[in-house]
Amino acid sequence: MLETRDHVDLSDFTPALGAQLGQMIVRIEHAMQRCDDIGRVHVNRWGDGGSHFHLWFMARPKGRMELYGYGLPLWYKILPPYDHDRWHANNRIVADALAENGGRVIEAAS
């Protein structure tokens, strides 16, 4: 999930902030695509509470074509559990990819 530091909604974005958001979306999608078991990245915006902007990045598992379209957020309830070690490895791949263009990887607490 990507969220703003300030409490704003998409309608509050300036053109400059919108341009930065677009660049960040592309960076995250490219980073997630480095994971060899991700077929596609879906980007969604939900939230009906005022001034809370969140984008959700959802990875469709490679080869799971039945997970097309808007139903992807519901599939997590029926998919088999994802391997915990693989999940951590993918998180590291994404973090390292994002850090290549500035920033640093922050290790999660155990």
Task: Name each model feature, range by range.
Residues 1-110:
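HIT superfamily nucleotide-processing domains
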